[in-house]
Amino acid sequence: MVTPRPAPARSPALLLLLLLATARGQEQDQTTDWRATLKTIRNGIHKIDTYLNAALDLLGGEDGLCQYKCSDGSKPVPRYGYKPSPPNGCGSPLFGVHLNIGIPSLTKCCNQHDRCYETCGKSKNDCDEEFQYCLSKICRDVQKTLGLSQNVQACETTVELLFDSVIHLGCKPYLDSQRAACWCRYEEKTDL
């Protein structure tokens, strides 16, 4: 008769090593989950901040006035080497709108307005007033050329609609253009 051999004794050191290896793997999984959670939270906060800034820009900035200024109160200066983007006529990439009414002088007014927005330090109000003057001149020229009040009225309605759009929806494009054209000396971008 064969007597069964006793089960080999496991050394306490080997058991401890296996236990630690298992615990370390779980700790690593938890650390990875914790880091992923933290990253998700950070990205969520960044998205909320981006949406809030976009809403503020769209509505007229923090103070309700659409003004570009450095956060420390210093005056923005023209960005060295900045090249303005080519004017896009009467439209806004922000809203996916591009108007091609076929009136060259209208496109000229819109292009001048785009350039004004991209001139560092130029106020939105000044740019918009120049734009309104340019637009109203188009209608005066139509009246001189055609002499028909019907055409002038249609021109004035179109100009008024375009100008109202710029007044109410132009803050974000203005601020984006100023951010691109200007530099604030004491501001440095920092990532979270």
From Swiss-Prot:
According to its UniProt record, which reaction does this protein catalyse? a 1,2-diacyl-sn-glycero-3-phosphocholine + H2O = a 1-acyl-sn-glycero-3-phosphocholine + a fatty acid + H(+)
| Pfam families reported in the protein's UniProt record | PLA2G12
Predominant location: secreted
Q: Which InterPro entries match?
A: PLA2G12, PLipase_A2_dom_sf, PLipase_A2_His_AS
EC primary class: hydrolase
* Subcellular location field: Secreted; Cytoplasm
The free-text cofactor remark is: Binds 1 Ca(2+) ion per subunit.
In terms of superkingdom, the source organism counts as Eukaryota
**Signal sequence annotation:** 1-25
List the GO biological process terms: arachidonate secretion; lipid catabolic process; phospholipid metabolic process
Q: Keywords assigned by UniProt?
A: Calcium, Cytoplasm, Hydrolase, Lipid degradation, Lipid metabolism, Metal-binding, Secreted, Signal
Output one GO MF annotation: phospholipase A2 activity
Cofactor(s) annotated in UniProt: Ca(2+)
An example GO CC term for this entry is: extracellular region
What are the binding positions for Ca(2+) in this chain?
Answer: G91, P93, F95, D114
Q: What is its EC number?
A: 3.1.1.4
Q: List the catalytic residues.
A: H113, D128
The record's family statement is:
Belongs to the phospholipase A2 family.
Its biological purpose is as follows: PA2 catalyzes the calcium-dependent hydrolysis of the 2-acyl groups in 3-sn-phosphoglycerides. Does not exhibit detectable activity toward sn-2-arachidonoyl- or linoleoyl-phosphatidylcholine or -phosphatidylethanolamine.
By what name is this protein known? Group XIIA secretory phospholipase A2
Q: Which source organism?
A: Mus musculus (Mouse)
The gene designation is: Pla2g12a
